[in-house]
Amino acid sequence: MTNIRKTHPLMKIINNSLIDLPAPSNISSLWNFGSLLGACLTIQIITGLFLAMHYTADTTTAFSSVTHICRDVNYGWTIRYLHANGASLFFLCLFIHVGRGLYYGSFVLLETWNIGIMLLFSVMATAFMGYVLPWGQMSFWGATVITNLLSAIPYVGTDLVEWIWGGFSVSKPTLTRFFALHFILPFIISALTMIHLLFLHETGSNNPLGMSSNPDKIPFHPYYTTKDFLGLLLLILLLMTLTLFYPDLLGDPDNYTPANPLNTPPHIKPEWYFLFAYAILRSIPNKLGGVVALIMSILILAIMPFLQPNKQQTMMFRPLSQFLFWILVADLLTLTWIGGQPVENPFINIGQMASILYFSLMVFIMPMTCLVENKMLKW
């Protein structure tokens, strides 16, 4: 008798994706982050669901309802901090996942890469709206500053901002719609993840050598299920350490003050995972230019497949490209640091130089280096 997992219509899909899937034999731990992102998404949906049971999306009671969750709901504080710190780990895994894709040339799998960019934008939008919900000072002013950027769009900008706000300022309608969107987006992200995996399994996974792995494949289970489980344990260890010992390490103290439209905080800044993009936005004096640079800082990933003329897919045997990749990582860390600093010298100048370097590396320096390496390899 044939095994039920190979014949049952539903079990067959799971079997072909997680059990009998032929996987390259040499993929490193950097390939673990896809499954870790799936775990993060699951944790966020479950904790978010329990938070939504006690949260009220109303300007007068939102802050109090979050306080109520932390003080009066059984293990409410755990759920709240698991959700908040889970978002940070989600982005940490996302950045490593995208970095792995750049380093090993995974962007040649165009459909998978482009859906991945859509996923990145969706997760960023979800996280931004989630940060507004506790209705603290940084929630309110963060929402005001970021939504106001849309007013830079010529002709329709102001109308668009007022349409998103549901009024003439960030107020009750804004909070209500942000909660509705924050609730629905993770399910859209889940659907996009399925499509992401569908396209990945069409071509098969990339590997550190960038060569075809067809001659040497191994079944996903038990090899990579075990490996992913170890990664998951380490992720949970890190998440629980953050949640139970340092719950407020990555948060902003200003968000423990209820939102006050009459009192602007001295330094308005988003969560740490948006600081690099925020630094790029602030480094351009023109409002529209800043918005374009902000969007392009992520959208530039979409043109990466067309900017890499390298004959070798991965950077594994290309030391010049490796060197530039790590300069790019250092540059992004610098931008993250600058995004959290006040708008004054020398931070303005450092931010502008780091922004120029970021776009130069992506658009010009790295592609030119690829051509040089091709020449050196006589390809």
Curated annotation (Swiss-Prot):
It comes from the Eukaryota. Gene3D superfamilies: Cytochrome Bc1 Complex, Chain C. The chain crosses the membrane at residues 33-53, 77-98, 113-133, 178-198, 226-246, 288-308, 320-340, 347-367. A ubiquinone binds at residue 201. Its cofactor is heme b. Keywords: Electron transport, Heme, Iron, Membrane, Metal-binding, Mitochondrion, Mitochondrion inner membrane, Respiratory chain, Transmembrane, Transmembrane helix, Transport, Ubiquinone. It is found in: Mitochondrion inner membrane. Pfam families: Cytochrom_B_C, Cytochrome_B. Heme b b562 binds at residues 83, 182. Heme b b566 binds at residues 97, 196. One of its GO terms (molecular function) is ubiquinol-cytochrome-c reductase activity. It is a multi-pass membrane protein. The keyword Membrane applies. The cytochrome bc1 complex contains 11 subunits: 3 respiratory subunits (MT-CYB, CYC1 and UQCRFS1), 2 core proteins (UQCRC1 and UQCRC2) and 6 low-molecular weight proteins (UQCRH/QCR6, UQCRB/QCR7, UQCRQ/QCR8, UQCR10/QCR9, UQCR11/QCR10 and a cleavage product of UQCRFS1). This cytochrome bc1 complex then forms a dimer. Component of the ubiquinol-cytochrome c reductase complex (complex III or cytochrome b-c1 complex) that is part of the mitochondrial respiratory chain. The b-c1 complex mediates electron transfer from ubiquinol to cytochrome c. Contributes to the generation of a proton gradient across the mitochondrial membrane that is then used for ATP synthesis. Belongs to the cytochrome b family. Heme 1 (or BL or b562) is low-potential and absorbs at about 562 nm, and heme 2 (or BH or b566) is high-potential and absorbs at about 566 nm. PANTHER family: CYTOCHROME B. This is Cytochrome b. It comes from Lepilemur aeeclis.
